Amino acid sequence: MKQLFYLALLLLGSSHLLANNIEVNNVSLTGQNTTDGFTLVQFDLSWENSWRISVGPANWDAAWVFVKYRVNGNLWQHATINLTGGNTPGGAELDVADDLTGAFLFRSADGTGNISWTNVQLRWNYRDDGVDDNALVDVQVFAIEMVYVPEAPFFVGTGFNGDEIDEFFTLAQFGPFFLRNPYQVSSEAAITVANAAGSLYYDSTVQGGDQAGPIPASFPKGFAAYYCMKYEVSQDQWIGFFNTLTQTQKEGLDVTGPLGKNTDDEIIRNTIAWPDGGNATTTNPNIPLNYVRNEFLMAYLDWSGLRLMTELEFEKACRGTLSAVGNEFAWGNSNIHNAIYTYTNEGLPNEQIADPGSGTGNAVFQ
């Protein structure tokens, strides 16, 4: 797959959270080829609750894997992965991104359960990255769980049967009147933006857009297949990113500083601490990251080889190919949980909501 982006949360009707527990172990370099200037980055990869299904939603989960390297203990850099030449164990499929920043690893056939793959190999073209054959190199392999969203038409907005703020709609004539209906995205072609029948439009009352158009064909609309993140960014994933940065970069992206929670102490389950001159740590590695400013988010995505998702892609990921429901949330209906959650195994990889409710979304807000 070629399109990558971040999704803060995607639960799609799940009644409880299952920890991802994605792990990369036993990283090594092997099979150096000094003629062509490449080596193989070898590692083991595992995660829980994996699936692939060819009917119904026809989707699967995957790991987005990328490599960072440094030469002689200097700055960490992003490794260039070759389109071909990698190796996968039985039952695994490898798809390297067109921009060579990383690769997707996923099931090659339908199935469910936990993944545990050993001796996965990616071909790193180190000479393309300006690394000498005899350089002393450190490498790190990072992995993020993703979900494949297949190509399909879908609807945005809920039309006259909802009262969302600044939602998408299209006008449809009903006798002497015009009604607001959901707008169907049926291709990646340019979309006309206008307050007219058959066009996409939206109000602009609360930090909305400029209502200008058209939306160009090159803009990701969600019709074509894409990947999105399965879970929120965890505190452990953030630390993995943060600890590869320079001192100056860390100071500008410090969630313990004035632009974040402004303390090394725990606040709202954020236990990230960054002692001066050291590496950041957390005692809640599996808990989602909070105190995230937009510039923090964009820096993490750029470092990961990902991009922000578009609003159109977000609605496709939540709704799929189903018809619109008035006032619906991301889980497909207008019901929200009306009580404070309690947890089992709080703070552990197998943490779960003990009282999720039935037919309600995983949210409590005012």
Feature roles, as predicted:
Residues 57-86:
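Extended low-complexity, serine/threonine- and proline-enriched intrinsically disordered segments
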